[in-house]
Amino acid sequence: MVVYLRPETNGIQTESVLFRVFKDPTWHSKVDLVYLANVPGAFLTDRGVVERHYSPRIRFARQGAAAFTPAMRDTFSRFFGVPFDKARVVGAYEALGLLGLDEEALFRIWVPVYDLIDIEGQLVKRVSDNLFVVNYDIPALMTKHHADSDVAAMVFRTELSYEEFRPAVDQIRSSLVKEGLLDPDKPEHRVFHWSRGPWEQLLDAHGYVYTVRDEPVDLADLAFGRFLLDKGETEQTILAALNDPFSSGRNLFTATLFDTFEGAYARFRAV
């Protein structure tokens, strides 16, 4: 399980909350910390790690409506009750100019829950009667990743499934709120990210877990990576899937959230 703290919340207070939770008797015998590193922002920036990690979401933030697949357009129309072709759907970067806002102001636009949807991992927010912004959070997120911002990355070894690990995440969230490190009405991903599926776990590890030689960890050293290799996949086919999760028309990462290794592999091979 890969966990990393976002640059704006990375610090000893947040780390302490996580460590306290995993020392709790409920989790102490079930979850082992096997990797901890503070990855320098300059290291990530020089290698284009963040851009690659978020490349699908950045593409939608730049292209807006043009990036939507037919299935995504149908989901949009059903949810918002507006024909996709009649709606003004723009990427976040175009929205900055249209609305005259900076990155943080765009990110902080509040809307009711019925004006916000996650479609294949892309966040769509209705900000006015017929203006919809795709991945409104990406410009702000990218500005927070710079040479002077670090990311704390952790790998936990566990036999718990993703669903079984979720209560630990809920406990961390409650502790963060109690410590004043997270607003009660905000989700935990404002502070930290955790891998919620096998393919997402590979993506996270490939971006934020490194060897002592400052090289990405080998796929064979990751549980799901080893599983795929044992199934006959090659490093090339695995990396191709990580780099282009929409090759099947669906987002491989979101399609396999909370999946088992076998289930995630079956979805990948069903393409």
Predicted features and spans:
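Non-catalytic terminal and connector segments of soluble metabolic enzymes
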Residues: 1-271
